[in-house]
Amino acid sequence: MDLLEGFDPNIELQTSHGIHHLYNFMNSANFFSRFIRNFDNFKETDFLFVCCRYVLTQIEKFTRGVPDHFEILAFRKDDIIYIGCDRSMITRKVLTEQSKLSIFSGLKFGKCLTTGDWSNLTDTHSIIRHIRIINHQTNSAHSVICSSTVRAFDNNSEPIEIHVKRDRKSFQHCIREWSFGARLSGSSKIIFGIRNENYKITKISETRSIRTDHSSALNMISEVLTMIAKLIENEKCVAVKPNFETQDMEFEKVDISYMNKSEQW
């Protein structure tokens, strides 16, 4: 399979984030009227958080020291806090040709593996789950409605994770990252293609997600959500970004007009 075939760097490939699908679902299904919180021995925050998986996986990568810069936006409406797309996307940051190629190759591999038709690469589906982020250190919990973009389901309607891996990239590094994403989507099966430097798939393999210890990532996510809830005012925004020198997160109150510049909101 040649992942370079059909690639055009002049075509913008921006798929809708999972948060976009989640908004549509909530609006059409009267979602929150059917939502019941689970109170137990953990002190649960007063807010319900709504986000796409991207937000949580970016924080998880930060706890592993992956130097992948991001800046996300949180917006509060009454007792619901929406955490959406990377703030840098709002200013329409120009992607490098290499970044565009990485996006294209991943989308094309998923389409070729499922429908065989990669004419519409931005057509995706989402799975929505209620996740409780528990911090045992602070005895606190956060309710999160998380939307994950998925490309395939098995015969039991369970989501399947599909990825592309560079042939010289460590499998153990990849499986840890993929497994955290699978944990959020509820998937246990991962299908991945191994590509060479010319973007040709040399092998397709299947594995299961591993139950590795994600406590440091979950604690960091809990701390981020706690700080957002503490800082954010009703109908206001807070931006969050990592500081790789201090190994901590930075928070900034920003003007709500940022939201109006993004098609994702």
Q: Where do the protein language model's features map onto the residues?
A:
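Accessory terminal regions of nucleic-acid processing enzymes
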Residues: 1-265
